[in-house]
């Protein structure tokens, strides 16, 4: 059986992305046919900064239509508009290749959101770009590993704005799209307020969540969604035995327990998109850039998910 062709966007080159590419190539190429969306010259520079520890000649690369950022001992670990622009163009090219069916999926290495902002890129990050590019699809951010997956009803929005987003119709649409994408038989839904609202004592949002759960289960014809569960106990061991699939109303409520349990191995997946996309579930790690300290478990797991 032929290996799948996966486009790998380079992420912010001042972080750990290029180290992950170089140190993981042998393992990744055993899983898929990787196409690295980066100018080969930058990989050579990265390898020099890593004391020429890796082989670079056998990597299949595709040059990006963007100015080459500086990459040297003075730039690594620092926010750069030029690096932000380059990482965006690498990611956009990956999407174009996937749209044209030239690759089977894309793996995105971590970007720096401030670098994108400095480069005047009008998107908060990868998922925001995908939501704008594929407006007819409800793109869902799901993070985790095969032991625990968390779907985020809201992702990169201020916590104070989440309450207004919790509306029955929008949540039903989200829940059904999440179930369709994952094919999960049981999904536990975290509440929004302390004690999942305590029957209205602590806010009205959880009553809306309950109504959305009931409507979604009715549409599916079986009791798929459980909750709303008090979020402070939703991830207890006895709860995680029920199902690996969860939904969180906000970013940190779902991701704090996930990263406490499975930080090194978790991945980020864009569900319900017309293309297949997975990513590492960590940032650029500027503090350890080019020190040969990057853990590649999340990156390899993202490739495994795509392959």
Swiss-Prot record:
Task: Indicate which residues the UniProt annotation says bind substrate.
Answer: 126-127, 259, 268, 277
Where does this protein reside within or beyond the cell? Cytoplasm
Q: What is its main location?
A: cytoplasm
Pathway assignment reads: Cofactor biosynthesis; pyridoxine 5'-phosphate biosynthesis; pyridoxine 5'-phosphate from D-erythrose 4-phosphate: step 4/5
Q: What cofactor(s) does the depicted protein rely on?
A: Zn(2+); Mg(2+); Co(2+)
The UniProt catalytic activity note for this protein reads: 4-(phosphooxy)-L-threonine + NAD(+) = 3-amino-2-oxopropyl phosphate + CO2 + NADH
Q: Name the Enzyme Commission number(s) assigned to this protein.
A: 1.1.1.262
Which UniProt keywords are given for this protein, alphabetically ordered?
Cobalt, Cytoplasm, Magnesium, Metal-binding, NAD, NADP, Oxidoreductase, Pyridoxine biosynthesis, Zinc
Look up the record and give one Gene Ontology term from the biological process aspect. pyridoxal phosphate biosynthetic process
User: What class does this enzyme belong to in the EC scheme?
Assistant: oxidoreductase
The keyword Magnesium belongs to this UniProt entry's keyword annotation? yes
Query: Its function?
Result: Catalyzes the NAD(P)-dependent oxidation of 4-(phosphooxy)-L-threonine (HTP) into 2-amino-3-oxo-4-(phosphooxy)butyric acid which spontaneously decarboxylates to form 3-amino-2-oxopropyl phosphate (AHAP).
| Protein family membership | Belongs to the PdxA family.
NCBIfam families from the UniProt entry: pdxA, PRK03946.1
Its quaternary organisation is: Homodimer.
Q: Which PANTHER family does the entry link to?
A: 4-HYDROXYTHREONINE-4-PHOSPHATE DEHYDROGENASE (PTHR30004), D-THREONATE 4-PHOSPHATE DEHYDROGENASE (PTHR30004:SF6)
Task: State the name under which the record lists this protein.
Answer: 4-hydroxythreonine-4-phosphate dehydrogenase
UniProt organism field:
Helicobacter pylori (strain Shi470)
Query: What is this organism's lineage?
Result: Bacteria, Pseudomonadati, Campylobacterota, Epsilonproteobacteria, Campylobacterales
